[in-house]
């Protein structure tokens, strides 16, 4: 997993060094917010998402390709599992991702994305408590639309598989989010 994260960071750094400065929509620094839902398939629960997003987009010279690196933090504290007195909540969820997009028009950009996702699961049963951080890789697709020179709207779907060394198996999540961002 550490090798995958290192490779993703190295690829992003090399892509940024090859990219030209900000030109057109979807480039430059951006901050925004997302609302959506995440379905935890192993727990059978759907949890509401409220995400803060920071990103940096850059254009590739002579093409309509746009790369975007982003960081997301989920403010939710949702219950992802509840059965027979056992309750598990997901909290402190964050992701670091890279999206490769293509401007099909000057104002519309579909993209594919890969992310590192990490969340803290807190379990309680009666008077017993425990927590474990799970992490993994998410893949997704989305689209953004520039409604003004500095404002963009977007929608994104992501599937992630999360695990850790103490957990046998994978937790699977499916997220659908819509959001707005301001670019600088």
Regions found by a protein language model. Give the residues of each.
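Gram-negative bacterial Sec-dependent N-terminal signal peptides
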Residues: 1-19
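Gram-negative outer-membrane beta-barrel domains
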Residues: 17-184
